[in-house]
Amino acid sequence: MDIIQAIIIGIIEGFTEFLPISSTGHMIVASKFLGVAETDLTKAYEVIIQFAAILAVMLIYREKITFKKIDLWMKLLFAFLPLAIVGFIFKDQVKALFNVQVVAWMFIIGGIIFLIVEYYYKEQAWHVKDVEKVSWTQAWWVGFAQIFSLIPGTSRAGATIIGGLLAGLDRKTSAEFSFLLAIPVMAVVSGYDLLKHYQDFADANWGAFLIGFIVAFIVAYATIKLFLVFLQRFTFVAFGIYRIIFGIFLLMIL
């Protein structure tokens, strides 16, 4: 992987990881057009840029990553449990699901679900507007929704945001809870992948890896900030439409 490829993939990871559009499908397209083979080394690089994305969230929400916010973090860990349990038990079945057809169709299905939810969703005065006021029950339902992100192409952000909306959170709080929930999820997943691929770093182009890490961090940081501004004025309809179009595009080219 050269520096240009590392930068482009870093941009895609940073931009798509926290939006409800699934980074998986975009990585597939990027790898195809960039001619990047799916090797252990590229998987190792993906681990590096995922850590960059985690750091972006931690920097933005650094005031919430303290012992004073222990109640919030207990709820986030509680929400993480369904995914951890189901993912561990059915890891082989989940791995068998990974193919482009599944990814494409989950883009389309996820897009349709977003459009349906937004058609009926109306923000109410009783909706939770502060991520620290999310209840244990609401945290559980967001965590339950996250299970569906085990299906490739679903989008972890998309599943948790939908779960948040259905559980009674407003749009911004749904997104913020999703961002924070990404920290334990991605830390565990990326940590596991790091242990699996640490030997592959011996052959790494560290210059490309470092630049990709920095790019992914900057893009993820900017994307989260802009996404929150976007949600103050708009709904998730645009993401639903985009998912459907991108899913059809995937079916046509791959």
From Swiss-Prot:
Membrane topology annotation: Multi-pass membrane protein
Catalytic activity: di-trans,octa-cis-undecaprenyl diphosphate + H2O = di-trans,octa-cis-undecaprenyl phosphate + phosphate + H(+)
Native source species: Sulfurovum sp. (strain NBC37-1)
Family of the protein in this entry: Belongs to the UppP family.
Primary subcellular site in the record, as a coarse category: membrane
Subcellular location: Cell inner membrane
UniProt cross-references to PANTHER family, sorted A to Z: UNDECAPRENYL-DIPHOSPHATASE (PTHR30622:SF3)
GO biological process: cell wall organization; peptidoglycan biosynthetic process; regulation of cell shape; response to antibiotic
Taxonomy, superkingdom: Bacteria
GO molecular function: undecaprenyl-diphosphatase activity
Protein name: Undecaprenyl-diphosphatase
Entry-linked InterPro entries: UppP (IPR003824)
Additional comment: Bacitracin is thought to be involved in the inhibition of peptidoglycan synthesis by sequestering undecaprenyl diphosphate, thereby reducing the pool of lipid carrier available.
Gene of this entry: uppP
